[in-house]
Amino acid sequence: MRTDNDQWDITISVGQTALFVAASRALEARKPHPLAVDHYAEVFCRAAGGDWVAAVEGTDPEHPLQTEFGVDFVNFQGARTKYFDDYFRRVADAGVRQVVLLAAGLDSRAYRLPWADGTVVYELDVPKVLEFKREVLRRHGATPTAERREVPVDLRDDWPAALRANGFDASQPSAWIAEGLLIYLPADAQELLFAGIDALSAPGSFVAIEESAPMPMDVFEVKRAEALASGDPNSFFALVFNEQCAPGEQWFSERGWTASTTTLNECLHEVGRPAPAPDSEAAQMTGSISLMWARKG
């Protein structure tokens, strides 16, 4: 179960969820007609070794990504990745040259998207996650397509100061992303995160988030109790918070941003992928998720 000052690397707790997502992106990239291609996702999984290699090779039929849930989850990751990739292309076309990846994890967009000259990508995450990513990509010989600046910081600490210390200019437009992040923050921390984004964003800035509507608390408590009883500290329901400070579109619209939200199931439909069956394990998850982007001013 999470604590106020818990720490992690790429193999435990919140950190290992980045590998699960990377394995999903790797499986999406292997499809005949992928929604998004992230070749580095498989590189990360192979570097982590063990079950993660089996996950991307599909050689372990018991791995969660080989189940019905896994098929739905890979579709989810393909659609989500495409949504945010398209967002960053709009951002680049609008002339924004500062990009901030909050809880960057194993996001490889600084290496795989065609950024305009002069773009700086700031990657915020805990030091051990950034170290793993840096070393794996260095050994692979990867070269970023923008100037990449690591900002080793826990988002529960003073991350705005750390971002500024690494050269971020709040007087210039910026583009932000919180992908796969908010469920790991309690509502008060979400509020602080949104406020920090708003305070550092000049007119013409953009933000994109993935958010989940909380499930009924009695349902969540049962799932959390089952997760804790399993003895697996990395179980999903032992890591997440069932909280939301406010729907993102509402929060940012009240502060002068123009926002647009789509549900994940709508996004799946738009890209030609099926939503999970109503009685499936993934249905509650995808049915609660929305994707939003907004522009300030």
UniProtKB/Swiss-Prot annotation:
E.C. number: 2.1.1.-
- Matching PANTHER family, A to Z? S-ADENOSYL-L-METHIONINE-DEPENDENT METHYLTRANSFERASE YKTD-RELATED, S-ADENOSYL-L-METHIONINE-DEPENDENT METHYLTRANSFERASES SUPERFAMILY PROTEIN
Query: Would you tell me the protein name for this molecule?
Result: Putative S-adenosyl-L-methionine-dependent methyltransferase MSMEG_0614/MSMEI_0598
- Top EC category: transferase
Which biological process, per GO, is one annotated for this protein? methylation
Which species does this protein come from?
A: Mycolicibacterium smegmatis (strain ATCC 700084 / mc(2)155) (Mycobacterium smegmatis)
Q: What UniProt keywords apply to this chain's record, in alphabetical order? A: Methyltransferase, S-adenosyl-L-methionine, Transferase
Annotated InterPro entries: Ppm1/Ppm2/Tcmp, SAM-dependent_MTases_sf, SAM_mthyl_Trfase_ML2640-like
Q: Which family does it belong to?
A: Belongs to the UPF0677 family.
Report residues binding S-adenosyl-L-methionine. D125, D154, L155
User: Has UniProt tagged this entry with the keyword Cytoplasm?
Assistant: no
Query: By its UniProt entry, which NCBIfam families does this protein fall under?
Result: mthyl_TIGR00027 (TIGR00027)
Task: Spell out the molecular function terms from Gene Ontology.
Answer: methyltransferase activity
The record describes the protein's role as: Exhibits S-adenosyl-L-methionine-dependent methyltransferase activity.
